[in-house]
A protein has these predicted regions:
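Solvent-exposed alpha-helices and their adjacent loops that cap or buttress functional pockets
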Residues: 21-23, 38-39, 92, 114-116, ...
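A conserved helix-loop-beta module that forms one wall/lid of the active-site cleft
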Residues: 92-154
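Internal nucleotide-binding/catalytic subdomain
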Residues: 154, 158-296
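Active-site "cap" helix and flanking loop/linker of ATP-utilizing ligase/carboxylase catalytic domains
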Residues: 248-270, 288-359, 371-372
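Generic C-terminus detector
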Residues: 369-373, 378-427
Length: 427
């Protein structure tokens, strides 16, 4: 069977790498892909933008694509799944209406309230003055979010009232995030431990993927600006078996059932960004309608099941017939970023020191990398993710750090403390 993966990041490299291991897969096409996907066995890049829906549909029809997996959020929010289904094509992902869970933070907060799913207290605003009045009433620390998609950067965790007021003015009067910022959500600051809880959904049945923990801040010890994610590890020890059961019972099933009840049957990856409170209660920070990046990279390193089979079963509404199998080891991925990220960053620097052959229990997934004149050069903010398995999170971290040191280019940087919470638990 031919398979199409939509997207061009490290997440898509990991999905293509895993899909290529399936005995069901003859050929994997990635649109548009990157320099990493181009190097994988059985994988070929296709020069079509992830948001050029008509061209993607035509390609899938012309190349007998039996399954399409959507990586990023943008194509989902513009209805790529609806278009593929209308053409009678098999695609794993939520419809445009169901993807509002990620596309609109206000929709999500209102949905959670309707279905009594635990989350932070919040209010939506479109005007500056009422928003500022609410901030002054609540005080800091407080969280200000741009409604809509802002590539993971439209969230300000304000530790002072001044910071919060600046963010509101920026997003509403200055509209710093274009259209996405014309409405803001202001919500209470939750002081717990974050976890990424990703599941596969076929409309009614749910198959949990491995848990993970992402590191959003650019600096060590979680300081500095928010990014798309600087590293992740799996599993997340904060999600104990008891908390896992609570998340399924209090968050995941009510969400899947609630979406279906409202006429937006949910199929695809569903990623709940959770805050686990000190008393063990999970609260929803956000939903994403896709696999996380960089969480996908360490999670795929641990997945022992056939990803293609799982997705096909989900497309057929038969997820209850399969069970995902996981390597019991821990995995950890560290993002190597370009100088200046998450602001304006350098591009076009040659990368050296990449592993020349496959090493068991280790993998470098490429993201913002392009091939130019036979060399690999940087062309994104998050350039690649070095990923390793270990008997403990600490061992996986040390192996990943060793790998990170070998990969070089001008001005590259990375966090050396990815996984620090789990490592502290292990000591």
């Amino acid at each position: 069977m031919n398979i199409l993966i939509i997207g061009n990041g490290g997440r898509e490299h990991a999905l293509a790498w895993k899909a290529a291991q399936s005995p069901l897969a003859d050929k994997i096409f990635v649109a548009p892909g990157n320099a990493g996907t181009a190097l994988e066995q059985k994988v070929e890049n296709v020069n079509i933008s992830a948001t050029d829906v008509p061209a993607l549909v035509k390609f899938a029809q012309d190349n007998h694509i039996g399954l399409t997996i959507v990586g990023p959020e943008a194509p989902l929010v513009i209805g790529v799944v609806d278009a593929f289904r209308a053409a009678g094509l098999n695609i794993f992902g939520p419809t445009q209406a169901a993807a509002q869970l990620e596309g609109s933070k206000a929709f999500t907060k209102d949905f959670l309230a309707r279905h009594k799913i635990p989350t932070a207290e919040y209010q939506n605003f479109t005007e500056v003055e009422p928003a500022l009045a609410y901030l002054r009433e609540k005080g800091a620390p407080i969280v200000v979010k741009a409604d809509g998609l802002a590539a993971g950067k439209g969230v300000i965790v304000a530790m002072t009232l001044q910071e919060a007021e600046d963010a509101v003015r920026d997003m509403l009067s200055g509209n710093a995030f274009g259209e996405a910022g014309s409405r803001v959500v202001i919500e209470e600051f939750l002081d717990g431990e974050e976890a990424s809880f990703i599941v596969m959904v076929d409309g009614k049945n749910v198959e949990p993927m491995a848990t993970s923990q992402d590191h959003k801040r650019v600096g060590e010890k979680d300081t500095g600006l928010n990014t798309g994610g600087m590293g992740a590890y799996s599993p997340a020890p904060v999600v104990t078996p008891e908390i896992h059961a609570r998340v399924m019972r209090e968050v995941i099933y009510p969400t899947v059932n609630g979406m279906a009840a409202e006429g937006n049957v949910y199929t695809g990856f569903l990623y709940a960004g959770l805050m686990i409170m000190p008393n063990g209660q999970p609260k929803v920070i956000e939903f994403n309608c896709r696999f996380g990046d960089p969480e996908t990279q360490p999670i795929m390193l641990r997945l022992e099941s056939d990803l293609v089979e799982l997705c096909l079963k989900a497309c057929d509404g038969k997820l209850d017939e399969v069970k995902s199998q996981w390597n019991p080891k821990a995995s950890l991925g560290i993002v190597l970023a370009a100088e200046g990220y998450p602001g304006d960053y350098r591009k076009g620097d040659e990368i050296s020191g990449l592993p020349q052959s496959a090493v068991e229990n280790e993998k470098v997934f490429l993201a913002g990398v392009e091939a130019k004149a036979g060399k690999l050069v940087t062309n994104g903010g998050r350039v690649l993710c070095v990923t390793a398995l270990g008997e403990s999170v600490f061992e996986a971290q040390q192996k990943a750090l060793k790998l990170a040191e070998q990969v070089q280019w001008k001005g590259r940087f990375y966090r050396r403390d990815i996984g620090y919470r789990a490592v502290a638990r292990e000591q």
